[in-house]
């Protein structure tokens, strides 16, 4: 981990100055979005608002992992607002820290007035110091930290949706179109569901997929919370591909307003030749477009994962790069990190019994965030 000292609002001098001037952020206290009437309406009033800013996602993270919501909000006389989502992760393994947001690829601050969001950033830092946080990590809003080095960087991809399915299909790479047609000709069918039973089907495939990638699966409690707080509110769905009544691929999608998100995907490697994952994505694209979505976000991709990057680009996606920013509150410095998606542990989880892998995942994910 490398450290950088950057002049500005989060610099060593800035930290000292704000500590001696608490009135700079007087009256700004963190809130739980579930306790704020009309929170989701505030989120949707912002062009960049997404489900990850919503009460549903906050309840999901709090319910699954016991995280503490510490969101900051300020309003303006003209009705404009600035919103800064944060969660406190309190771990005896990795320490106490703030993340915007855990288990989330991107969740940028929402604002129209730069002065307002800077005030919220300062309030969050002072709150973090009062709580003994080691650090604060922002997964979005890179423009607010000019001159700061990124702690991590990833690719992101988004697909433009429209009602004309033929036009969308024509934008797909030829290999993707062939895969979809092959799945359809092979008798692969796709069902859309918001049920707990469908989530259990997905989770079984998810455990297989995580083993293939050499990673422990997330605890089922997390996906049960997604069902309880998101799917039951019609804010998402599960698409399941089956062949001869056997599930071979499944994915979890979210949608709030015009923004849809591909959040999790899983498949049975033994049936990869049937291209279930491709037809699942295609049916999800059509479903979200019919339900008013204008974009489908495909999540983050590690810079070194060329295979996943090619898969996402094959859907006619627009590629961008997202940079996270992490600030060490103990030393008043920005820090850089290494993407640790791959490592020696992948070989271990490739061979561990599934029961043991699930147990490890249930313990570790609460601390890793």
Please provide the spans of the model-predicted regions.
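A gly/proline- and charged-residue-enriched helix-loop-helix capping module
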Residues: 99-140
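Aromatic (often tryptophan-rich) hydrophobic motifs at membrane interfaces
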Residues: 72-84, 89, 104, 116-127, ...
